[in-house]
Design a protein with these regions (language model features):
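Nucleic-acid endo/exonuclease domains
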Residues: 1-122
Length: 122
């Protein structure tokens, strides 16, 4: 299905927290990044891509871990996540996955994983 409206406005609580972190640290990012050669029935999107660091970020809500909707989407979600993991590895792109239970730790996770990469580059 085609995404409607402003993707940032439609983002989740976890995604909003990540957006705030990236903006607070003036880290340029692409929201809802897609690669033309990454598909499963349709295009797959990563939540965030930071070109400068060649890093993707995925915030994984509960539906990535539990069959919440009971409509077959859980199995599809598992397949999509695995394809995204493999794509990142095969293209030498760092992928940071943040599970929903780490919502309160988003800032510390990103500080550790992103800011250390920025320091390495300088």
């Amino acid at each position: 299905t085609e995404r409607q409206g402003c993707p940032v406005c439609n983002s989740t609580k976890g995604e909003n927290s990540i957006i705030k972190f990236l903006q607070d640290y003036n880290i340029n990012f692409v929201f809802q990044m897609k690669f033309d050669d990454l598909k499963y029935k349709s295009n797959l999107y990563y939540d965030f891509y930071i070109p400068y660091l060649n890093t993707l970020i995925e915030y994984d809500g509960e539906f990535h871990y539990f069959d919440i909707f009971k409509n077959g989407s859980f199995e599809t979600s598992l397949i999509r996540d695995e394809l995204k993991n493999k794509y990142a590895i095969s293209n030498n792109i760092d992928l940071i996955r943040i599970p929903y239970w780490d919502f309160n730790n988003i800032e510390s996770i990103l500080t550790q994983k992103l800011l250390s990469k920025i320091k390495e580059d300088n």
